[in-house]
Amino acid sequence: MEEKKKEIRISVRNLVEFILRSGDLDNSSGGFGERDAMQAGTRVHQQIQKKRGADYRAEVPLVHEKEYEHFILRVEGRADGMYEDGTTTVIEEIKGTYRDLETMEEPVPVHLAQAKCYAYIYGLQNRKEEMGVLMTYTLLSSEEEGLLRPLTKEEVKPEHSNWRIRHFLQTYKLPELEQWFDELLDAWFIWAEFQYQWQ
């Protein structure tokens, strides 16, 4: 009887952080603790998600499995949001930060990688030719500092950016995402296979 392969589960976030080793919720520059940052991050996530419109899907679960010789890799996570923009499906990743958004010129690589993973998994499973990726950064506030006023519907539009919120929208062909995702898994596999051999 053939032995059942071991399943290794890893979140999208842990996968990209392990490979890229940089960036995360920026809670260091404001002098506030991790708990404050998490609570503030949850508030801004909910604000943005509620203002996106009726066709917006929040917290979309996504799973991808790949079989290797000795084990099965299960990559899983939740996209912050998803919506249709014409013929293109857009995956949104929302990040809270204390940094100056007006000087931000591009998404943090590890954040963008997280969103691209979700875009590839959804695009593959739903036979999409291309996928949009919207990175949304919004300024956090703490209870000590006083809460910022709620974001307006105009501010959460992808084409809008100011000192409180910044958007980066990119479109990728699915073959481009597939090649990128495969390279990400190849980098992870080298480590995983080494660990397996030394068990």
Residue ranges, per PLM feature:
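Mg2+/Mn2+-dependent nuclease catalytic core
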Residues: 65-177
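Conserved pre-motif I regulatory segment
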Residues: 195-199
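Charge-rich, solvent-exposed alpha-helical interaction surfaces
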Residues: 180-183
